[in-house]
Amino acid sequence: MNLLVVGSGGREHAISKKLLESNNVENVYCAPGNDGMRLDNIQLVAISETDKAGLIDFAKKAEIAFVIVGPEVPLLEGVVDALEEAGIKAFGPKANAALIEGSKDFAKQFMEKYAIPTAASKTFTDYAEAKAYLDERGVPIVIKADGLAAGKGVTVALEMEEAVLALKDMMLEEKFGDASLKVVIEDFLAGEEFSLMAFVNGEEVYPMAIAQDHKRAYEGDKGPNTGGMGAYSPVPHISETVVDEAVEKILLPAAKGMVKEGRYFRGILYAGLILTAEGPKVIEFNARFGDPETQVVLPRLESDFAALIDALLHNEKPDVRFKKSGITLGVVLASAGYPEHYEKGNKLTGLNDVAEDVAIYHAGTKQDENDDFISDGGRVLLLAKEAETMTDARTLLYPEMQKLDNPNFFYRIDIGTKAE
C-alpha cells in the first residue's frame, strides 16, 4: 500500500513513522511534511495541506490506498469531503463533523443537548455583555476564543485584570481574527487534566491509551498556554475506572450525538478532560490526533496501525491494542519566545549526538543549504523515550534534551514529575 499523510508537524511525523512499521505498507508520503521526516524514510510532497486539487491529483497518480488528514485546519476546510467526493478513501471527519473542534460554542451547545459533563458557560459576541458577565461570575474563570487559535485561544484567568485583558484582546483587538469575534466564558474547573483520544466510526468508539499534556509554557504550569510542551502515556494516577467512565459518559454519547445531528464522525475524537470531584468533565473536544500526545501514544500501539485505519475505512472492527507495561515520555524543544514572538532560522545543535534509542519527531524544522537543521516554527521538535517507570524515563530522556541546549531554544524540565 501507498499512503498519504496531510500535515507538517510532529504529530504527522509520528503518524507517518508508525504507518511505515505496518506489514503491507510500501511508501508513506507526507504533504507538505518537514525535512526531518526524511530521516525516517517518509517521502515529502510539496503540496499545501489545504490544496484539495493538488492532494486529489497526487493521490490518484501515486495510487494512494488512503489518506490521513492530521491538522484541524484542512479538516475544517473540507479536505476529507473533497477527497471522498473524488473517490479517494480519507481518514478524518468531514467539515460538518470537525465543527466539534472548530467552534467552542457549537461544542458547548452540543454537550448541553446530550448531557455530556462540562463546565457551565455562556457565549458572547458583545464586549459589554461579556464584561458584565465576567464581573458577575468573578475569578478564577476561563475565556476561550470560539474558533481555531492553534491551542493559544484559551486564558485561564486567576485575577480579574488578566480576565479583562484577555477579553479585550479577543473581542476588541481581534487578537485571533474571526476566531475571537465570538467568545465563550466558562467556569473554572479544578482537578487533574488528561487527554483521551479514540478511533471513532459513527457510533463505534475504540479508545486509545490516555496521555497527559502540559499546556503552559513554563515549569510549574506557569506562563501562557501553548500547543503543548510535552506529554506522557499512560497516566498512572488516573485509574481505569475513571477512563471507563469517561468513555461511557463522554465519548460514546458524543459519537452517538454526532450521528443524530447528521454529522457522522469518522476519525479521531480527542477529549481534553479534567477529573473533578464529580468525575471526568470535558474541557475541549478536538477532531484529530493531539500534538504532542500522538508522539507518546502511537508508539505504544501494538496492533498494525495501517490495518487498523483500513478496517475503520471499510466499516470493519479494528484490532486496537496498546502496551500495558512501561511509560513513554516526550519533551518539546521550542523556540525562545514561543508562544508569543520568536525567531525562525536558528541552527539546531547536538541533534546527531542524541542516543539512537530516543525517538526524534520533527515539527518546526527545515534544512538549510548545508543540510543543517534550522528552526522553522514555535515548537521545533520532540524527543521521546520509553522506559519501565517515569523516573527511568526522565533519567534517560533529559540528558538527551541537554545535548540540544542552546540559548535560542527552551524546554520544560518538569514534564512527567506528576507521574513519578
UniProtKB/Swiss-Prot annotation:
Alphabetical GO biological process terms: 'de novo' IMP biosynthetic process; purine nucleobase biosynthetic process
Binding residue positions for Mg(2+): E284, N286
Keywords: ATP-binding, Ligase, Magnesium, Manganese, Metal-binding, Nucleotide-binding, Purine biosynthesis
Disulfide bonds: none
Protein EC: 6.3.4.13
Domain annotation ATP-grasp: ranges: 108-314
Pathway listed: Purine metabolism; IMP biosynthesis via de novo pathway; N(1)-(5-phospho-D-ribosyl)glycinamide from 5-phospho-alpha-D-ribose 1-diphosphate: step 2/2
Cofactor names: Mg(2+); Mn(2+)
Recorded superkingdom: Bacteria
Protein name: Phosphoribosylamine--glycine ligase
Encoding gene, per UniProt annotation: purD
